[in-house]
Design a protein with these regions (language model features):
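Transmembrane alpha-helix boundary and packing residues in multipass membrane permease domains
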Residues: 16-20, 60, 64, 94, ...
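Residue-identity detector for threonine
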Residues: 30-33, 60, 98, 143
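Membrane-spanning alpha-helical segments of multipass transporters and channels
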Residues: 70-186
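Transmembrane helix-boundary elements of multi-pass transport/secretion proteins
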Residues: 1-57, 65-75, 108, 154-186
Length: 186
């Protein structure tokens, strides 16, 4: 359960900060510039991506040291998965901020995103749940990050061994980037 909690905290904190930042700029009118929507999205992904990189790395290292977790695999692999999940959370936060018209409304999206991640991503074992609940889990990015983190931390898997999970997370990232570019309002 500890590996998926690392992923959960990375997802939650990056999602929260990224969504609020873009929304604040959109509401204040500072996005009304002649740049393309794709440039805004890529700029946010780059700028906040550096923050996501630092935050994911910090949460991972502090979580492992603070909880005295024994890692059978590579800590570098754990950080790679956490950072990739951080980028997915960043893109997801930006996407949801395009639908919000106020910070209060953005805060209302948080339970809609966080609660399913808690119940259906593997924090509570999916194999003990009904089929419909397991299907919901298969459409959540934290499920794949949790599986990869668990395999690396508890079984010593390498990045090649969790390639399917990495591929799914990358697909989530690309789809979310495309949706961000198409859906961004100024």
């Amino acid at each position: 359960m500890v590996p998926i909690l690392i992923g959960f905290f990375v997802f939650f904190f990056v999602f929260l900060i990224s969504g609020m930042a873009l929304l604040k700029e959109r509401i204040s009118g500072t996005l009304a510039t002649p740049v393309k929507r794709s440039e805004i999205v890529y700029g946010y992904m780059l700028g906040y991506g550096l923050m996501a990189l630092a935050q994911a790395s910090l949460i991972t290292v502090v979580g492992i040291k603070l909880l005295d977790i024994e890692i059978i695999g590579s800590i570098f692999s754990v950080i790679i998965i956490a950072v990739l999940l951080g980028f997915v959370a960043l893109a997801f936060g930006i996407l949801l901020s395009t639908f919000a018209s106020s910070e209060f409304q953005m805060m209302q999206f948080i339970p809609l995103v966080v609660v399913p991640q808690i119940f259906f991503s593997g924090i509570i074992p999916l194999d003990s749940m009904a089929d419909w609940a397991q299907r919901i889990g298969k459409i959540l990015p934290l499920t794949y990050a949790g599986e990869a983190l668990s395999a690396i931390i508890m079984q010593g898997a390498g990045l090649i061994d969790v390639g399917k999970d990495i591929l799914v997370l990358m697909i989530f990232l690309v789809v979310l980037l495309i949706l961000n570019i198409l859906g961004l309002k100024r």
